[in-house]
Amino acid sequence: MNKQLQDLLITIVAGMGMLLSTLDTGIINIALPFLKEQFQTSTDIAAFTITGYTLALAISILPLGVLSDKFGKLKISYLGFVLFGLSSLFCGLINNISLLIIGRIFQGIGAAALQATSAALITTLVSEKRKNSSIGILGIMIGLGPILGPSLGGIILSLSFWQLIFLINIPFVILGIACNNFLLNKLSEKNNKRQLDILGITINALMLVSLLLGLSLLNKLHLFIVGIILILSSLLLGIIFYYVELNNKHALIDIKGLKNNPQVISYLLQTVTFGFASAMIFLLPPFIFEQSYHLEVGQTGFLVLGAPTGLVLFSRISSKINNGDKNKLFSHIGLSIIIISLIFLLLINPNWPYQLLTLGLFIYGIGGGYFQPANIASIMQASPMEIQGSTGALQRMLQNIAISIGSAIGATCLNIWSNDLLLATRIGWGITLILVIISLKEVIKFFHHK
């Protein structure tokens, strides 16, 4: 097969999978009030359509990463497209909230297979000269999903055809399956003989359920203590997981390997920080535009596009000028620009023109555009080729968890200081700024000592 065609098809499969899996979260978020009315249920029950998807994705992504190393990234990606497509069709055809939640759980498992394999498909199968460009496109898809979701969801709901929020996935799934199937028939992958770590998977699942459910309860004052208990339980389970996996030959996460490779730990710390920061960037600005500047929802929806616009543009630009040897430099540049944007956002007050807030978001997007593709490439390059699927899955899981933590802390700030929006947002920006500075400082320290 023509190498250029192969690279194109792999990039389509990886990018399409990442876009679908991130797009679907944003679409369902805006549909919650509609689903509550449609199924005559409570907000808490309707919210399980989000919680079920998120938990299924988080729990299954690491095992699917291991399976992709064992059986092949293309096979697991193919499974992901099929499962995601069938569950999307199921969700679009049923008219029962319990069945919808079940469908969303299977959709989350399909999304996990797509996210677990996206970066690994590129790093193991795309030619060296196009690898960075493909990773840049993957970064664009990661940035587009969360922002296109709410916009697309709003348009679909305005048509009074809520089933379309699920059925719209089908044409893209068919394209992904067609490309994936063609590649499966033309390519062979090098696989390893890793075994599934059932004990590690079980502890990891319990840890993630406790953490994510605990985070979801933090902004409910009457359940705040329960949320804290669940989060503390997840920390205890995390400690148990660490010691169980440390000397496990078939560990779900190669703890011993990570301890011997502090470079990867530094990159993963950056990933977590960026996920946390991105959650704040998407959560806080709409409140500022609507409550401080008294703008309409339509205007707000347009003005918050600053961050994803910057991320999409500069993901493409940075990947064009980076041939793979500038990943460390671009990571540092990206984090430094993010720090500048957070300082700018921290200083903004309602007396400033609201356009400056969009400018601050755009500057953040520029930093993200430099940082994210370089960070993904750095993590994958620093990991052995035989565990690229597991590494990609770990990177996505950590970023997803960081997004959940950032969203929970941001929402908690807004609830605690509900009468002082400026203070609430500044505390959110301040926490984020400190984390990014620590992340950049630790990375620079590592490379300086190296």
Give names to the regions the model predicted.
Residues 22, 26, 92, 108-116, ...:
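Small-residue-rich segments within alpha-helical transmembrane domains of MFS-like 12-TM solute carriers
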Residues 35-36, 67-68, 152-160, 215, ...:
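Interfacial helix-cap and linker-helix signal at transmembrane-aqueous boundaries
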Residues 65-199:
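Helix-loop-helix hairpins in multi-pass membrane proteins, especially solute transporters
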Residues 159-273, 277, 302-303:
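Hydrophobic transmembrane-helix bundles of small-molecule transporters
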